[in-house]
Amino acid sequence: MKSDPTLLRWYRRINKEFFKGACPDSVCVRWADPDEGESRRWEKKYFGEASVSEEDERHDWQIVMSKPLNKMWMVRISTLVHEMIHLATRLKDDHGPKFETWRVLLGKRGIFKKHALRRGYTLF
């Protein structure tokens, strides 16, 4: 599998600036492929998914995002950050205390401040 270059650039920047490198480097960040069949039927319901990359020998992890639901930049980046938190916890904590700890830490590091990632935009 191949990462979307723009999504991967955002992933790397956010990982460096706000996660301080806590998210894995060996990750494929891509849009869902409508031809993937049943495993991606969620694309019209869910914004994204972080998982272990089982079909890809080049990457250990993957973030797959729904293109139809992530059209706006702010939604797209919010989804990416959400899925990155799952990777930072190594998928050990769905939306529990570890996830919340990361969300709070990212807030303290300024990710939710106006202009933190793009001029004129605020996440969440």
Model-derived features: where do they sit?
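Active-site-proximal or metal-binding-adjacent scaffold patches in catalytic folds
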Residues: 1-78, 87-124
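Walker B catalytic acidic pair
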Residues: 83
